[in-house]
């Protein structure tokens, strides 16, 4: 105790200061320090393991590389899937397209049935390409990938499709008779209908009176002029009550409705031929149409 009192303040501070080990290799601390990595003096407690410590995180967590790549991959719609992928996924028919594809079907399609289950797409191509150019062809498969025994072939030209039907219909392929029918036809543009002459109906009741009564059997005594009397005889029949030729053919105004009274006396009828009557009738028809 007395020794401590005799020591100076600096010596007391130096004696109470705990020796610190260095973090470098082979620390400089006193005591039993063995100089390991991050070691400290014997009085500084157990050494820490810094191997598992990492730097400060910039994010709360990190995703696995594989999961991140799968998440960042571009999503693709089924619209952009190929025919082969759709057929493999849903089991539809496999179709081979010859040449560039088109969204509009322009060829003539044949439907082939009663095929042997061992017939392949190459067999169909080899068989029907001998007739003409093919746009596409294919065997129909079910969901399990087995052939349904049917196929379809699309020819570029309709004439080739008809020739294929005549050549291969009811012909054996691998021991079975093929049944071929046309299901896709090229419909030519419909021909324009022949325009008939326009039929203009005559007015039945207009400013000229009852046209049917005047010309369809009942001649009212007025034919671009006034007849004598109130005749209602038929145009081709015998007049009644004065009728045809009951007065003079005077060039006055024709009456409306039933025949008016003629302005002439009892003279002889003028000789009128059939041609004159036809001409007058045509003229009256023309005036009736212009008036209406």
From Swiss-Prot:
Where is the protein found, in the record's own terms?
Nucleus, Nucleoplasm
The RRM domain covers which part of the protein?
108-185
Residues annotated with N-acetylserine modification: 2
According to the record, the residues making up region (Disordered) are 1-50, 241-292
Residue spans with biased composition (Gly residues)? 23-42, 241-252
Q: Which UniProt keywords apply?
A: Acetylation, mRNA transport, Nucleus, RNA-binding, Transport
Which residues fall in a compositionally biased region of kind Basic and acidic residues? 280-292
> Which GO CC annotations does the UniProt entry carry?
nucleoplasm; plasma membrane
Q: Which InterPro entries match?
A: ALYREF_mRNA_export, FoP_C, Nucleotide-bd_a/b_plait_sf, RBD_domain_sf, RRM_dom
Record bears the keyword Disulfide bond = no
Q: Which Pfam families match?
A: RRM_1
One GO biological process term is:
mRNA transport
Q: Which SMART domains match?
A: FoP_duplication (SM01218), RRM (SM00360)
PANTHER family xrefs: RNA AND EXPORT FACTOR BINDING PROTEIN, RNA ANNEALING PROTEIN YRA1
Record family assignment: Belongs to the ALYREF family.
Q: How does it assemble?
A: Interacts with RH15 and RH56.
Q: What is this protein called?
A: THO complex subunit 4B
Q: Which organism is it from?
A: Arabidopsis thaliana (Mouse-ear cress)
Q: Which gene encodes it?
A: ALY2
């Amino acid at each position: 105790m007395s020794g401590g009192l005799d020591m100076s303040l600096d010596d007391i501070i130096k004696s109470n200061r705990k020796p610190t080990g260095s973090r470098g290799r082979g620390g400089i601390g006193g005591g039993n320090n063995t100089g390991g990595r991050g070691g400290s003096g014997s009085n500084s407690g157990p050494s820490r393991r810094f191997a598992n410590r990492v730097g400060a995180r910039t994010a709360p967590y990190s995703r696995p590389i594989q999961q991140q790549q799968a998440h960042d991959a571009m999503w693709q719609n089924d619209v952009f899937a190929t025919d082969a992928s759709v057929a493999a996924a849903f089991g539809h028919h496999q179709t081979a397209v010859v040449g560039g594809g088109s969204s509009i079907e322009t060829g003539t399609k044949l439907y082939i049935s009663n095929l042997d289950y061992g017939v392949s797409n190459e067999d169909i191509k080899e068989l029907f390409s001998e007739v003409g150019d093919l746009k596409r062809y294919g065997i129909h498969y079910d969901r399990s990938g087995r052939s349904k025994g049917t196929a379809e072939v699309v020819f570029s030209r309709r004439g080739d499709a008809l020739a294929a039907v005549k050549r291969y219909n009811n012909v054996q392929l691998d021991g079975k008779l093929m049944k071929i029918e046309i299901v896709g036809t090229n419909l030519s543009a419909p021909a324009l209908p022949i325009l008939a002459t326009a039929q203009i109906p005559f007015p039945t009741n207009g400013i000229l009176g009852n046209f049917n009564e005047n010309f369809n059997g009942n001649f009212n005594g007025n034919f671009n002029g006034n007849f004598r009397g109130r005749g209602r005889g038929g145009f081709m029949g015998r007049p009644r009550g004065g009728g045809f030729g009951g007065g003079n053919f005077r060039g006055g105004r024709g009456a409306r409705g039933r025949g008016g009274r003629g302005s002439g006396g009892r003279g002889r009828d003028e000789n009128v031929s059939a041609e004159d009557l036809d001409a007058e009738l045509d003229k009256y028809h023309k005036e009736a149409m212009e008036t209406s």
